[in-house]
Protein backbone atom coordinates (compact mmCIF):
# COMPACT_ATOMS: atom_id res chain seq x y z
CA UNK A 1 0.00 0.00 0.00
CA UNK A 2 1.38 3.42 -0.91
CA UNK A 3 2.49 5.76 1.85
CA UNK A 4 0.10 8.57 2.77
CA UNK A 5 1.11 11.94 1.34
CA UNK A 6 0.22 15.57 1.88
CA UNK A 7 -1.03 16.14 -1.67
CA UNK A 8 -3.55 13.94 -3.43
CA UNK A 9 -4.55 12.06 -0.29
CA UNK A 10 -4.45 15.14 1.92
CA UNK A 11 -7.33 17.40 2.96
CA UNK A 12 -8.69 20.13 0.75
CA UNK A 13 -7.27 23.59 1.40
CA UNK A 14 -8.73 25.16 4.50
CA UNK A 15 -10.68 22.05 5.50
CA UNK A 16 -10.38 20.88 9.12
CA UNK A 17 -7.37 23.18 9.69
CA UNK A 18 -8.74 24.81 12.83
CA UNK A 19 -7.40 23.05 15.93
CA UNK A 20 -10.16 20.85 17.28
CA UNK A 21 -11.60 20.97 20.76
CA UNK A 22 -10.34 17.75 22.31
CA UNK A 23 -12.73 15.68 24.42
CA UNK A 24 -12.23 15.91 28.16
CA UNK A 25 -11.05 12.53 29.46
CA UNK A 26 -10.81 12.06 33.19
CA UNK A 27 -7.22 12.17 34.53
CA UNK A 28 -5.23 9.13 35.57
CA UNK A 29 -6.60 7.31 38.60
CA UNK A 30 -3.21 5.84 39.48
CA UNK A 31 -0.54 8.48 38.94
CA UNK A 32 2.75 7.36 40.51
CA UNK A 33 1.18 4.68 42.69
CA UNK A 34 3.22 1.76 41.39
CA UNK A 35 6.47 3.73 41.51
CA UNK A 36 6.27 3.76 45.30
CA UNK A 37 4.34 0.53 45.88
CA UNK A 38 5.99 -1.46 48.67
CA UNK A 39 6.20 -5.17 48.00
CA UNK A 40 6.88 -7.78 50.68
CA UNK A 41 10.49 -8.14 51.80
CA UNK A 42 12.80 -10.59 50.05
CA UNK A 43 12.61 -12.87 53.08
CA UNK A 44 8.79 -12.86 53.01
CA UNK A 45 8.73 -13.57 49.28
CA UNK A 46 11.27 -16.39 49.66
CA UNK A 47 9.08 -17.96 52.35
CA UNK A 48 6.05 -17.74 50.04
CA UNK A 49 7.95 -19.37 47.18
CA UNK A 50 9.27 -22.14 49.39
CA UNK A 51 5.78 -23.03 50.60
CA UNK A 52 4.37 -22.76 47.06
CA UNK A 53 7.03 -25.17 45.75
CA UNK A 54 5.96 -27.83 48.27
CA UNK A 55 2.27 -27.42 47.41
CA UNK A 56 3.04 -27.43 43.70
CA UNK A 57 4.48 -30.93 43.97
CA UNK A 58 1.54 -32.13 46.06
CA UNK A 59 -0.83 -31.01 43.32
CA UNK A 60 1.40 -32.58 40.66
CA UNK A 61 1.07 -35.91 42.45
CA UNK A 62 -2.72 -35.47 42.50
CA UNK A 63 -2.76 -35.04 38.72
CA UNK A 64 -0.55 -38.07 38.17
CA UNK A 65 -2.69 -40.11 40.54
CA UNK A 66 -6.00 -39.24 38.85
CA UNK A 67 -7.33 -42.04 36.64
CA UNK A 68 -11.12 -41.84 36.29
CA UNK A 69 -12.48 -39.50 33.62
CA UNK A 70 -14.80 -37.58 36.00
CA UNK A 71 -11.92 -37.02 38.43
CA UNK A 72 -9.53 -35.89 35.68
CA UNK A 73 -12.06 -33.51 34.10
CA UNK A 74 -12.98 -31.87 37.41
CA UNK A 75 -9.35 -31.51 38.46
CA UNK A 76 -8.15 -29.93 35.21
CA UNK A 77 -11.06 -27.48 35.00
CA UNK A 78 -10.44 -26.47 38.62
CA UNK A 79 -6.74 -25.89 37.92
CA UNK A 80 -7.61 -23.84 34.83
CA UNK A 81 -10.02 -21.63 36.73
CA UNK A 82 -7.50 -21.06 39.53
CA UNK A 83 -4.78 -20.35 36.95
CA UNK A 84 -2.59 -23.19 38.18
CA UNK A 85 -2.66 -25.21 34.97
CA UNK A 86 0.42 -23.57 33.45
CA UNK A 87 2.53 -25.31 36.11
CA UNK A 88 1.54 -28.73 34.77
CA UNK A 89 1.32 -28.55 30.98
CA UNK A 90 2.93 -31.95 30.33
CA UNK A 91 0.91 -33.77 32.98
CA UNK A 92 -2.34 -32.15 31.85
CA UNK A 93 -1.72 -32.92 28.18
CA UNK A 94 -1.17 -36.56 29.10
CA UNK A 95 -4.45 -36.68 31.01
CA UNK A 96 -6.33 -34.88 28.23
CA UNK A 97 -5.37 -37.73 25.92
CA UNK A 98 -6.95 -40.14 28.39
CA UNK A 99 -10.15 -38.06 28.49
CA UNK A 100 -10.29 -37.77 24.70
CA UNK A 101 -9.80 -41.50 24.12
CA UNK A 102 -12.47 -42.35 26.68
CA UNK A 103 -15.23 -41.54 24.14
CA UNK A 104 -17.57 -41.02 27.07
CA UNK A 105 -21.16 -40.68 25.85
CA UNK A 106 -23.14 -41.78 28.89
CA UNK A 107 -26.25 -40.24 30.34
CA UNK A 108 -24.57 -37.95 32.88
CA UNK A 109 -25.28 -34.47 31.47
CA UNK A 110 -22.88 -32.76 33.86
CA UNK A 111 -19.94 -34.98 32.91
CA UNK A 112 -20.72 -34.99 29.18
CA UNK A 113 -20.91 -31.18 29.24
CA UNK A 114 -17.72 -30.69 31.23
CA UNK A 115 -15.80 -33.20 29.11
CA UNK A 116 -16.95 -31.45 25.93
CA UNK A 117 -16.07 -28.03 27.39
CA UNK A 118 -12.59 -29.12 28.45
CA UNK A 119 -11.64 -30.93 25.26
CA UNK A 120 -12.89 -28.30 22.85
CA UNK A 121 -11.30 -25.51 24.88
CA UNK A 122 -7.99 -27.37 24.67
CA UNK A 123 -8.23 -27.71 20.89
CA UNK A 124 -9.65 -31.22 20.51
CA UNK A 125 -12.12 -31.91 17.71
CA UNK A 126 -15.16 -33.25 19.58
CA UNK A 127 -18.71 -33.56 18.28
CA UNK A 128 -21.66 -31.71 19.77
CA UNK A 129 -23.88 -34.66 18.82
CA UNK A 130 -23.24 -36.02 22.33
CA UNK A 131 -25.94 -33.61 23.53
CA UNK A 132 -28.71 -34.94 21.30
CA UNK A 133 -29.49 -37.72 23.77
CA UNK A 134 -30.58 -35.11 26.32
CA UNK A 135 -33.56 -34.07 24.20
CA UNK A 136 -37.06 -35.52 24.29
CA UNK A 137 -39.07 -36.86 21.36
CA UNK A 138 -40.21 -33.35 20.47
CA UNK A 139 -36.64 -32.13 20.20
CA UNK A 140 -36.67 -30.13 23.43
CA UNK A 141 -33.99 -30.37 26.09
CA UNK A 142 -35.07 -32.26 29.19
CA UNK A 143 -34.81 -30.37 32.47
CA UNK A 144 -32.09 -31.52 34.86
CA UNK A 145 -30.45 -30.45 38.10
CA UNK A 146 -29.04 -26.92 38.16
CA UNK A 147 -25.39 -27.98 38.29
CA UNK A 148 -25.79 -30.06 35.13
CA UNK A 149 -27.62 -27.29 33.30
CA UNK A 150 -24.90 -24.84 34.29
CA UNK A 151 -22.29 -27.18 32.81
CA UNK A 152 -24.33 -27.51 29.61
CA UNK A 153 -24.70 -23.72 29.43
CA UNK A 154 -20.95 -23.17 29.73
CA UNK A 155 -20.15 -25.92 27.24
CA UNK A 156 -22.56 -24.56 24.65
CA UNK A 157 -20.63 -21.30 24.31
CA UNK A 158 -17.84 -23.20 22.56
CA UNK A 159 -20.20 -23.58 19.61
CA UNK A 160 -19.23 -23.18 15.99
CA UNK A 161 -21.37 -22.58 12.92
CA UNK A 162 -23.94 -25.25 12.18
CA UNK A 163 -24.20 -26.55 15.74
CA UNK A 164 -27.91 -25.96 16.20
CA UNK A 165 -27.99 -28.22 19.25
CA UNK A 166 -25.67 -25.83 21.09
CA UNK A 167 -27.61 -22.74 19.98
CA UNK A 168 -30.74 -24.37 21.40
CA UNK A 169 -28.88 -25.41 24.56
CA UNK A 170 -27.98 -21.78 25.28
CA UNK A 171 -31.56 -20.58 24.86
CA UNK A 172 -32.92 -23.38 27.04
CA UNK A 173 -30.38 -23.24 29.86
CA UNK A 174 -30.33 -19.45 30.01
CA UNK A 175 -34.08 -19.36 30.57
CA UNK A 176 -34.08 -22.11 33.21
CA UNK A 177 -31.05 -20.76 35.09
CA UNK A 178 -32.54 -17.27 35.20
CA UNK A 179 -35.77 -18.71 36.62
CA UNK A 180 -33.95 -20.75 39.28
CA UNK A 181 -31.34 -18.18 40.30
CA UNK A 182 -33.24 -16.54 43.16
CA UNK A 183 -33.86 -19.93 44.78
CA UNK A 184 -30.23 -21.09 44.79
CA UNK A 185 -27.83 -21.11 47.72
CA UNK A 186 -24.16 -20.16 47.86
CA UNK A 187 -21.79 -21.02 46.20
CA UNK A 188 -23.96 -22.34 43.33
CA UNK A 189 -25.89 -19.06 43.25
CA UNK A 190 -22.67 -17.12 42.62
CA UNK A 191 -21.63 -19.61 39.95
CA UNK A 192 -24.91 -19.27 38.06
CA UNK A 193 -25.00 -15.49 38.40
CA UNK A 194 -21.43 -15.18 37.08
CA UNK A 195 -22.18 -17.51 34.16
CA UNK A 196 -25.28 -15.58 33.13
CA UNK A 197 -23.17 -12.42 33.13
CA UNK A 198 -20.18 -14.00 31.36
CA UNK A 199 -20.01 -17.68 30.33
CA UNK A 200 -16.99 -19.50 31.73
CA UNK A 201 -15.22 -19.79 28.36
CA UNK A 202 -15.30 -16.01 27.84
CA UNK A 203 -13.87 -14.92 31.19
CA UNK A 204 -10.51 -13.17 31.49
CA UNK A 205 -8.14 -15.65 33.13
CA UNK A 206 -6.70 -13.27 35.72
CA UNK A 207 -10.17 -12.19 36.83
CA UNK A 208 -11.47 -15.74 36.97
CA UNK A 209 -8.49 -16.68 39.14
CA UNK A 210 -9.29 -13.85 41.56
CA UNK A 211 -13.05 -14.45 41.58
CA UNK A 212 -12.99 -18.24 41.76
CA UNK A 213 -10.74 -18.56 44.82
CA UNK A 214 -13.50 -17.51 47.29
CA UNK A 215 -16.06 -19.66 45.47
CA UNK A 216 -13.77 -22.69 45.54
CA UNK A 217 -13.11 -22.03 49.22
CA UNK A 218 -16.84 -22.54 49.89
CA UNK A 219 -17.00 -25.74 47.84
CA UNK A 220 -17.62 -28.78 50.03
CA UNK A 221 -15.35 -30.80 47.71
CA UNK A 222 -12.44 -28.34 47.78
CA UNK A 223 -8.92 -29.68 48.23
CA UNK A 224 -6.93 -27.77 50.86
CA UNK A 225 -3.59 -28.12 49.07
CA UNK A 226 -5.05 -26.80 45.80
CA UNK A 227 -6.74 -23.92 47.62
CA UNK A 228 -3.62 -22.91 49.52
CA UNK A 229 -1.47 -23.17 46.40
CA UNK A 230 -3.99 -21.06 44.45
CA UNK A 231 -3.81 -18.31 47.07
CA UNK A 232 -0.01 -18.33 47.19
CA UNK A 233 0.20 -18.43 43.40
CA UNK A 234 -2.15 -15.43 43.14
CA UNK A 235 -0.08 -13.43 45.61
CA UNK A 236 3.19 -14.31 43.87
CA UNK A 237 1.74 -13.35 40.48
CA UNK A 238 0.53 -10.11 42.02
CA UNK A 239 4.12 -9.30 43.00
CA UNK A 240 5.27 -9.92 39.44
CA UNK A 241 2.46 -7.86 37.94
CA UNK A 242 3.16 -4.98 40.35
CA UNK A 243 6.84 -5.02 39.40
CA UNK A 244 5.93 -4.90 35.70
CA UNK A 245 3.51 -2.05 36.38
CA UNK A 246 6.35 -0.13 38.02
CA UNK A 247 8.47 -0.61 34.90
CA UNK A 248 5.62 0.44 32.58
CA UNK A 249 4.75 3.47 34.71
CA UNK A 250 8.40 4.59 34.72
CA UNK A 251 8.48 4.31 30.92
CA UNK A 252 5.19 6.21 30.57
CA UNK A 253 6.27 9.04 32.88
CA UNK A 254 9.27 9.77 30.63
CA UNK A 255 6.85 10.86 27.92
CA UNK A 256 5.37 13.54 30.23
CA UNK A 257 1.87 12.98 28.88
CA UNK A 258 0.21 15.28 31.42
CA UNK A 259 2.10 18.29 30.02
CA UNK A 260 3.03 17.33 26.45
CA UNK A 261 -0.07 15.38 25.44
CA UNK A 262 -2.73 16.42 27.93
CA UNK A 263 -5.51 15.62 25.46
CA UNK A 264 -4.86 11.84 25.45
CA UNK A 265 -6.23 9.20 27.81
CA UNK A 266 -3.69 8.65 30.60
CA UNK A 267 -4.39 4.98 31.23
CA UNK A 268 -1.13 3.07 31.61
CA UNK A 269 -2.41 0.79 34.41
CA UNK A 270 -5.61 0.07 32.51
CA UNK A 271 -3.59 -0.66 29.35
CA UNK A 272 -1.44 -3.10 31.30
CA UNK A 273 -4.50 -4.93 32.64
CA UNK A 274 -6.10 -5.12 29.21
CA UNK A 275 -2.98 -6.45 27.53
CA UNK A 276 -1.82 -8.74 30.33
CA UNK A 277 -5.23 -10.40 30.22
CA UNK A 278 -4.21 -11.82 26.85
CA UNK A 279 -0.98 -13.42 28.08
CA UNK A 280 -1.05 -13.55 31.87
CA UNK A 281 1.14 -16.56 32.65
CA UNK A 282 4.44 -15.52 34.26
CA UNK A 283 6.65 -16.62 31.36
CA UNK A 284 5.10 -13.94 29.13
CA UNK A 285 6.43 -10.97 31.08
CA UNK A 286 8.21 -9.54 28.04
CA UNK A 287 5.04 -9.77 25.95
CA UNK A 288 3.03 -7.93 28.60
CA UNK A 289 5.50 -5.06 28.74
CA UNK A 290 5.80 -4.74 24.95
CA UNK A 291 2.02 -4.89 24.59
CA UNK A 292 1.49 -2.21 27.23
CA UNK A 293 3.89 0.16 25.50
CA UNK A 294 2.45 -0.51 22.05
CA UNK A 295 -1.17 0.02 23.10
CA UNK A 296 -0.17 3.16 24.98
CA UNK A 297 1.24 4.41 21.67
CA UNK A 298 -1.97 3.36 19.89
CA UNK A 299 -3.95 5.40 22.42
CA UNK A 300 -1.82 8.47 21.73
CA UNK A 301 -2.20 8.01 17.98
CA UNK A 302 -5.94 7.43 18.25
CA UNK A 303 -6.63 10.43 20.48
CA UNK A 304 -4.32 12.69 18.48
CA UNK A 305 -5.70 11.85 15.06
CA UNK A 306 -9.33 11.46 16.16
CA UNK A 307 -9.77 14.46 18.36
CA UNK A 308 -6.86 16.90 18.40
CA UNK A 309 -4.71 17.16 15.28
CA UNK A 310 -5.78 19.03 12.18
CA UNK A 311 -6.06 16.94 9.05
CA UNK A 312 -2.80 18.40 7.77
CA UNK A 313 -1.00 17.52 11.02
CA UNK A 314 -2.47 14.02 10.87
CA UNK A 315 -1.04 13.47 7.40
CA UNK A 316 2.33 14.83 8.53
CA UNK A 317 2.42 12.32 11.38
CA UNK A 318 1.36 9.52 9.04
CA UNK A 319 4.17 10.35 6.63
CA UNK A 320 6.73 10.50 9.44
CA UNK A 321 5.67 7.06 10.68
CA UNK A 322 5.84 5.68 7.15
CA UNK A 323 9.41 6.94 6.85
CA UNK A 324 10.35 5.69 10.35
CA UNK A 325 13.49 7.76 10.63
CA UNK A 326 14.67 10.45 13.04
CA UNK A 327 15.03 12.92 10.18
CA UNK A 328 11.25 12.76 9.63
CA UNK A 329 10.71 14.61 12.92
CA UNK A 330 11.19 17.83 10.93
CA UNK A 331 7.80 17.19 9.30
CA UNK A 332 5.95 17.41 12.60
CA UNK A 333 4.44 20.19 14.70
CA UNK A 334 6.21 20.75 18.02
CA UNK A 335 3.73 18.86 20.19
CA UNK A 336 4.23 15.66 18.17
CA UNK A 337 8.03 15.63 18.07
CA UNK A 338 8.79 14.14 21.49
CA UNK A 339 6.18 11.44 20.99
CA UNK A 340 7.61 10.48 17.60
CA UNK A 341 11.18 10.29 18.87
CA UNK A 342 10.07 8.25 21.88
CA UNK A 343 8.26 5.84 19.54
CA UNK A 344 11.46 5.24 17.57
CA UNK A 345 13.55 4.96 20.74
CA UNK A 346 11.17 2.40 22.26
CA UNK A 347 11.23 0.22 19.16
CA UNK A 348 15.03 0.31 19.15
CA UNK A 349 14.95 -0.86 22.76
CA UNK A 350 12.73 -3.78 21.72
CA UNK A 351 15.37 -4.86 19.19
CA UNK A 352 18.14 -4.63 21.77
CA UNK A 353 16.16 -6.59 24.37
CA UNK A 354 15.24 -9.36 21.94
CA UNK A 355 18.83 -9.86 20.84
CA UNK A 356 20.19 -10.95 17.44
CA UNK A 357 18.10 -14.13 17.15
CA UNK A 358 14.69 -12.54 17.73
CA UNK A 359 15.10 -8.86 16.80
CA UNK A 360 13.76 -9.64 13.30
CA UNK A 361 10.30 -9.72 14.90
CA UNK A 362 10.38 -5.95 15.42
CA UNK A 363 10.28 -5.49 11.63
CA UNK A 364 6.79 -7.02 11.62
CA UNK A 365 5.81 -4.80 14.53
CA UNK A 366 6.88 -1.67 12.65
CA UNK A 367 4.96 -2.79 9.58
CA UNK A 368 1.86 -3.36 11.72
CA UNK A 369 2.11 0.20 13.09
CA UNK A 370 2.51 1.61 9.58
CA UNK A 371 -0.48 -0.39 8.35
CA UNK A 372 -2.56 0.88 11.27
CA UNK A 373 -1.73 4.51 10.50
CA UNK A 374 -2.44 4.07 6.78
CA UNK A 375 -5.96 2.96 7.66
CA UNK A 376 -6.29 5.89 10.08
CA UNK A 377 -5.63 8.27 7.19
CA UNK A 378 -8.43 6.67 5.18
CA UNK A 379 -10.81 7.22 8.09
CA UNK A 380 -9.68 10.86 8.32
CA UNK A 381 -10.58 11.26 4.66
CA UNK A 382 -14.01 9.71 5.34
CA UNK A 383 -14.51 12.14 8.21
CA UNK A 384 -13.43 15.22 6.28
CA UNK A 385 -15.63 14.36 3.31
CA UNK A 386 -18.59 13.25 5.48
CA UNK A 387 -18.44 9.91 3.70
CA UNK A 388 -20.50 6.99 4.94
CA UNK A 389 -19.49 3.58 3.52
CA UNK A 390 -22.39 1.97 1.72
CA UNK A 391 -22.09 -1.36 3.53
CA UNK A 392 -20.64 -2.78 6.71
CA UNK A 393 -18.33 -4.90 4.56
CA UNK A 394 -16.87 -1.77 2.92
CA UNK A 395 -16.35 -0.17 6.33
CA UNK A 396 -14.60 -3.22 7.76
CA UNK A 397 -12.06 -3.32 4.93
CA UNK A 398 -10.52 -0.32 6.67
CA UNK A 399 -11.75 -0.42 10.25
CA UNK A 400 -10.86 -4.01 11.17
CA UNK A 401 -7.22 -2.91 10.71
CA UNK A 402 -7.56 0.55 12.26
CA UNK A 403 -8.92 -0.93 15.50
CA UNK A 404 -5.47 -2.40 16.12
CA UNK A 405 -6.23 -6.10 16.51
CA UNK A 406 -3.44 -7.24 14.20
CA UNK A 407 -0.97 -4.95 15.95
CA UNK A 408 -1.95 -6.32 19.37
CA UNK A 409 -1.46 -9.93 18.28
CA UNK A 410 1.82 -9.08 16.59
CA UNK A 411 3.03 -7.36 19.79
CA UNK A 412 2.14 -10.39 21.90
CA UNK A 413 4.06 -12.81 19.70
CA UNK A 414 7.07 -10.48 19.43
CA UNK A 415 7.71 -10.86 23.15
CA UNK A 416 7.22 -14.62 23.42
CA UNK A 417 10.00 -17.20 23.54
CA UNK A 418 11.29 -19.74 21.05
CA UNK A 419 7.79 -21.10 20.39
CA UNK A 420 7.23 -18.13 18.04
CA UNK A 421 8.82 -18.52 14.61
CA UNK A 422 9.11 -16.35 11.53
CA UNK A 423 6.28 -18.44 10.07
CA UNK A 424 3.98 -17.34 12.91
CA UNK A 425 4.95 -13.67 12.51
CA UNK A 426 4.18 -13.87 8.78
CA UNK A 427 0.88 -15.59 9.55
CA UNK A 428 -0.23 -12.74 11.83
CA UNK A 429 0.49 -10.20 9.09
CA UNK A 430 -1.04 -12.23 6.23
CA UNK A 431 -4.77 -11.51 6.62
CA UNK A 432 -5.29 -14.93 8.18
CA UNK A 433 -8.97 -15.71 8.74
CA UNK A 434 -8.59 -16.02 12.52
CA UNK A 435 -6.83 -12.65 12.73
CA UNK A 436 -9.56 -11.04 10.58
CA UNK A 437 -12.33 -12.53 12.71
CA UNK A 438 -10.62 -11.19 15.81
CA UNK A 439 -10.27 -7.75 14.23
CA UNK A 440 -13.95 -7.67 13.29
CA UNK A 441 -14.89 -8.73 16.82
CA UNK A 442 -12.80 -5.94 18.36
CA UNK A 443 -14.15 -3.33 15.95
CA UNK A 444 -17.81 -4.21 16.45
CA UNK A 445 -17.46 -4.52 20.23
CA UNK A 446 -15.77 -1.12 20.38
CA UNK A 447 -18.28 0.65 18.19
CA UNK A 448 -21.32 -0.60 20.09
CA UNK A 449 -20.21 1.26 23.24
CA UNK A 450 -18.29 4.21 21.77
CA UNK A 451 -20.47 5.49 18.93
CA UNK A 452 -22.68 7.84 20.96
CA UNK A 453 -19.70 9.41 22.74
CA UNK A 454 -17.62 9.87 19.62
CA UNK A 455 -20.41 11.35 17.52
CA UNK A 456 -20.79 14.35 19.83
CA UNK A 457 -18.12 15.94 17.63
CA UNK A 458 -17.05 15.55 14.02
CA UNK A 459 -15.75 12.01 13.82
CA UNK A 460 -15.31 9.20 11.34
CA UNK A 461 -18.57 7.31 10.89
CA UNK A 462 -18.69 4.09 12.92
CA UNK A 463 -19.80 0.62 11.90
CA UNK A 464 -23.00 1.26 13.85
CA UNK A 465 -23.92 4.30 11.75
CA UNK A 466 -22.94 2.50 8.58
CA UNK A 467 -25.19 -0.42 9.55
CA UNK A 468 -28.03 1.99 10.37
CA UNK A 469 -27.83 3.53 6.92
CA UNK A 470 -27.44 0.20 5.12
CA UNK A 471 -30.50 -1.34 6.79
CA UNK A 472 -32.52 1.84 7.49
CA UNK A 473 -32.87 1.16 11.22
CA UNK A 474 -32.34 3.06 14.48
CA UNK A 475 -29.10 3.16 16.45
CA UNK A 476 -30.52 0.90 19.17
CA UNK A 477 -31.68 -1.63 16.57
CA UNK A 478 -28.29 -1.51 14.87
CA UNK A 479 -26.45 -2.10 18.15
CA UNK A 480 -28.61 -5.13 18.94
CA UNK A 481 -28.05 -6.63 15.51
CA UNK A 482 -24.32 -5.95 15.67
CA UNK A 483 -24.22 -7.76 19.02
CA UNK A 484 -25.47 -10.79 17.11
CA UNK A 485 -22.60 -10.32 14.66
CA UNK A 486 -20.14 -10.41 17.58
CA UNK A 487 -21.65 -13.77 18.55
CA UNK A 488 -20.96 -14.86 14.98
CA UNK A 489 -17.36 -13.71 15.40
CA UNK A 490 -16.99 -15.93 18.48
CA UNK A 491 -18.10 -18.91 16.39
CA UNK A 492 -15.64 -18.03 13.64
CA UNK A 493 -12.75 -17.62 16.09
CA UNK A 494 -13.45 -20.95 17.77
CA UNK A 495 -13.80 -22.94 14.55
CA UNK A 496 -10.80 -21.26 12.93
CA UNK A 497 -8.77 -21.89 16.07
CA UNK A 498 -9.71 -25.57 16.00
CA UNK A 499 -8.66 -25.80 12.35
CA UNK A 500 -5.24 -24.21 12.96
CA UNK A 501 -3.40 -27.50 13.37
CA UNK A 502 -0.09 -26.46 11.77
CA UNK A 503 0.70 -23.97 14.54
CA UNK A 504 1.31 -24.54 18.27
CA UNK A 505 -1.75 -24.24 20.51
CA UNK A 506 -0.44 -20.97 21.96
CA UNK A 507 -1.35 -19.23 18.67
CA UNK A 508 -5.15 -19.70 18.66
CA UNK A 509 -5.17 -19.63 22.47
CA UNK A 510 -3.60 -16.15 22.48
CA UNK A 511 -6.18 -14.84 20.01
CA UNK A 512 -9.03 -16.15 22.16
CA UNK A 513 -7.47 -14.77 25.35
CA UNK A 514 -7.44 -11.30 23.80
CA UNK A 515 -11.03 -11.76 22.63
CA UNK A 516 -11.94 -12.35 26.28
CA UNK A 517 -10.26 -9.13 27.40
CA UNK A 518 -12.05 -7.21 24.65
CA UNK A 519 -15.37 -8.72 25.69
CA UNK A 520 -14.75 -7.62 29.28
CA UNK A 521 -13.51 -4.10 28.49
CA UNK A 522 -16.43 -3.33 26.16
CA UNK A 523 -19.24 -5.10 28.00
CA UNK A 524 -21.96 -2.50 28.68
CA UNK A 525 -19.46 0.40 28.64
CA UNK A 526 -16.03 1.50 27.44
CA UNK A 527 -14.13 0.62 30.61
CA UNK A 528 -10.87 1.85 29.15
CA UNK A 529 -12.05 5.39 28.50
CA UNK A 530 -14.21 5.57 31.64
CA UNK A 531 -11.89 3.61 33.89
CA UNK A 532 -13.55 4.52 37.20
CA UNK A 533 -15.66 1.44 36.50
CA UNK A 534 -12.71 -0.91 37.00
CA UNK A 535 -10.68 0.89 39.68
CA UNK A 536 -11.83 -1.43 42.50
CA UNK A 537 -11.22 -4.50 40.36
CA UNK A 538 -7.70 -3.38 39.52
CA UNK A 539 -7.00 -2.70 43.19
CA UNK A 540 -8.09 -6.22 44.14
CA UNK A 541 -5.98 -7.69 41.33
CA UNK A 542 -2.76 -5.73 41.73
CA UNK A 543 -2.71 -4.28 45.24
CA UNK A 544 -4.63 -6.39 47.74
CA UNK A 545 -3.19 -9.87 48.36
CA UNK A 546 -5.50 -12.81 48.99
CA UNK A 547 -5.68 -13.64 52.69
CA UNK A 548 -4.21 -17.03 53.48
UniProtKB/Swiss-Prot annotation:
InterPro entries xref list: Isoprenoid_synthase_dom_sf, Terpene_cyclase-like_1_C, Terpene_cyclase_plant_C1, Terpene_synth_N, Terpene_synth_N_sf, Terpene_synthase-like, Terpene_synthase_metal-bd, Terpenoid_cyclase/PrenylTrfase
Residues where substrate binds: 302, 306, 443, 446
Cofactor binding, per record: Binds 3 Mg(2+) or Mn(2+) ions per subunit.
Catalysed reaction, written as an equation: (S)-beta-bisabolene = (S)-beta-macrocarpene; (2E,6E)-farnesyl diphosphate = (S)-beta-bisabolene + diphosphate; (2E)-geranyl diphosphate = (4S)-limonene + diphosphate; (2E)-geranyl diphosphate = beta-myrcene + diphosphate
Positions contributing to Mg(2+) 2 binding: 302, 306
Pfam families named among the record's database cross-references: Terpene_synth, Terpene_synth_C
Motif DDXXD motif per UniProt: ranges: 302-306
EC number: 5.5.1.17, 4.2.3.113, 4.2.3.55, 4.2.3.15
Main location: cytoplasm
Misc. comment: In the presence of magnesium, the product spectrum is shifted toward an increased production of (S)-beta-bisabolene and a decreased production of (S)-beta-macrocarpene.
Subunit note: Monomer.
Role of this protein: Involved in the biosynthesis of the bicyclic sesquiterpene (S)-beta-macrocarpene. Can use both geranyl diphosphate and farnesyl diphosphate as substrate, but not geranylgeranyl diphosphate. Produces mainly (S)-beta-macrocarpene, but also smaller amounts of beta-bisabolene and (E)-beta-farnesene when used with farnesyl diphosphate as substrate. In the presence of geranyl diphosphate, produces the acyclic monoterpenes beta-myrcene and linalool along with minor amounts of the cyclic compounds limonene, alpha-thujene, sabinene and alpha-terpinolene. May be involved in plant defense.
Name of this protein: (S)-beta-macrocarpene synthase
Species of the source: Zea mays (Maize)
Amino acid sequence: MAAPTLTADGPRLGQQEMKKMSPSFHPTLWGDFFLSYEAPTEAQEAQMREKAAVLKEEVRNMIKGSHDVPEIVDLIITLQRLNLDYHYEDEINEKLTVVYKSNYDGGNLDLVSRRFYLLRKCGYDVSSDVFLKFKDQLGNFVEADTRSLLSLYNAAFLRIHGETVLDEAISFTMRVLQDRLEHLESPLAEEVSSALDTPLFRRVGTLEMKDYIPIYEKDAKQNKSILEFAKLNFNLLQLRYSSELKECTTWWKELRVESNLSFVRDRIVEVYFWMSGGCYDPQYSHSRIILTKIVAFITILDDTLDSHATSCESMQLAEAIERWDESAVSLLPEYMKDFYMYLLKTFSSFENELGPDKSYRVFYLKEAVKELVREYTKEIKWRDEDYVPKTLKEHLKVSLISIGGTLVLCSAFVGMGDVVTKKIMKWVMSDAELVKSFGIFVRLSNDIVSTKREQREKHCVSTVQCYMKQHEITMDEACEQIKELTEDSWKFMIEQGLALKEYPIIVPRTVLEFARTVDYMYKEADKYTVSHTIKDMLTSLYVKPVLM
